[in-house]
Structures are given as C-alpha cells and as structure tokens.
C-alpha cells in the first residue's frame, strides 16, 4: 500500500472565471457532493480529492479562485503553478462569457505557451430560461482556444465529475505530447476536439443541457 502511494500522481487543477459564475459551487459539488446555494465571494480555497480516472489513481489538488477584479493580482501566482484550468462562465451572464478570453490569454502569457490544458465550462445549465449565452457560442469559443467544452449544473450535479475528469485527461495528453514531441490521441476519443458527445448525468432533469457536448 505504501509503495502504491509513493507513485500516486498529483494534479494541480485551478478553477477560474468571473464572480458569481458558480466556481465554488462546482468545486464543492465535485469534492463533497454538496450544493452550496448561498453566494459568498471566494478569495482562495484549496481542496484535495483522490479518484480513479481511466483506471489510474489520481490525487486532485483543486484551487478555487476569486473572480472579483480586486483580487486580480493573485491570478498570476496560481497560474504559474496550475497544471490545468477550468475556465468557468455562467450561461446566464454574457459578461462572464466575455471574461473567459481574458483569463485564457493571461494563462498563456504566464505559462509562455501557445496552448495549455484548459476546458471551457458553461455552468448553470439548469437555468435555461435565463440563458444569455448559446451553447454554440461556448462551443465556438472552445474551438477557438483548441480545447474541449462542456455545460454543467452544480445545483443538479450535471457533468460536474466529467468536467474535472476531462481536464485531468487533457493534462495527461499534454504531458505525453511534451515528452514525445507529437500529438497524443485523446482519451476516450481519437479525433479532434468536438468529435464526441458527452453523456448526461443520470440525475439530469429532462430538457436540461440537452445534447451537452465536449468540443
């Protein structure tokens, strides 16, 4: 048992996005299977969870970050240490969607890379009647970034585990590419981004996030 723990791979995941998009709710739902319905602006919280992804044990170190502009100076610090990023916006807020490009550009600048493991996450898909950002817009933005896209609901636990698991897969793929110098085959796929449909969570409400895809 001790020998196995010695080789336990740790992944540093960072959840970024504007204020009020549900970053903390998404993170706590993933870590604790609990929905936090009150909004309490986060400065910075760290969580750890051990799980199995594609038959490999992984220790996830998840950093939930501040979305408010006044904490912007802290961003570069966690961007330097993060191995992968969930870029979260709310489908009910066009402003939060537009902020995603700023976060993405900052990550690439801090990392001094043309690409890096990220996933665009459209949260609050249970609030379809308040939608301001179309699914195709999120998918197109992710395609522009060269990454995957997923719609989630922290409240109804829709695609929450899938968002974090797929980010770990992207980190693994990125690391293989860095080691071999050539593109790796995506886990669970084999085609380019956007080539397969994400299964909806079994607890999903009818009509919510219909046809959620990772693109």
Curated annotation (Swiss-Prot):
Keywords in alphabetical order: Cell membrane, GTP-binding, Hydrolase, Lipoprotein, Membrane, Methylation, Nucleotide-binding, Prenylation
Catalytically driven reaction(s): GTP + H2O = GDP + phosphate + H(+)
Class of this enzyme: hydrolase
Primary location group: membrane
Membrane topology, from the record: Lipid-anchor
Superkingdom: Eukaryota
Record has Lipoprotein as a keyword: yes
SUPFAM superfamilies xrefs: P-loop containing nucleoside triphosphate hydrolases
Record-linked InterPro entries: P-loop_NTPase (IPR027417), Small_GTP-bd (IPR005225), Small_GTPase (IPR001806), Small_GTPase_Ras-type (IPR020849)
Gene3D superfamilies linked to this entry: P-loop containing nucleotide triphosphate hydrolases (3.40.50.300)
Annotated motif Effector region, positions: 39-47
Compartments (UniProt record): Cell membrane
Residues recorded with modification Cysteine methyl ester: 212
Propeptide section residues: 213-215
Lipid attachment, kind S-farnesyl cysteine: 212
Region (Disordered): 179-199
Gene Ontology CC terms: plasma membrane
SMART domains reported in the protein's UniProt record: RAB, RAN, RAS, RHO
Family note: Belongs to the small GTPase superfamily. Ras family.
Function: Ras proteins bind GDP/GTP and possess intrinsic GTPase activity.
NCBIfam families: small_GTP
Protein name as it appears in the record: 24 kDa Ras-like protein
Gene: CC-RAS
């Amino acid at each position: 048992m001790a020998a196995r723990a010695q080789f336990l791979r740790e992944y540093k995941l960072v959840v970024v996005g504007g204020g009020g998009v549900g970053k903390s709710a998404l993170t706590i739902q993933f870590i604790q299977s609990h929905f936090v319905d009150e909004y309490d602006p986060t400065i910075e919280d760290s969580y750890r969870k051990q799980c199995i992804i594609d038959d490999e044990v992984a220790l996830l170190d998840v950093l939930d970050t501040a979305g408010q502009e006044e904490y912007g100076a802290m961003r570069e610090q966690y961007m330097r240490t993060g191995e992968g990023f969930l870029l979260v916006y709310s489908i009910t807020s066009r402003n939060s969607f537009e902020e995603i490009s700023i976060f993405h550009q900052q990550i690439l600048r801090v990392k001094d890379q043309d690409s890096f493991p990220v996933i665009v996450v459209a949260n609050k898909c249970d609030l379809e009647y308040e939608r301001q950002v179309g699914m195709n817009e999120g998918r197109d933005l992710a395609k522009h970034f060269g990454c995957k896209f997923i719609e989630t609901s922290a409240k109804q636990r829709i695609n929450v585990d899938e968002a974090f698991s797929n980010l770990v897969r992207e980190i693994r793929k990125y690391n293989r590419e860095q080691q071999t110098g050539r593109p790796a085959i995506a886990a669970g796929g084999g085609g380019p981004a956007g080539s397969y449909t994400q299964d909806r969570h079994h607890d999903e409400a009818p009509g919510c996030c219909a046809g959620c895809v990772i693109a």
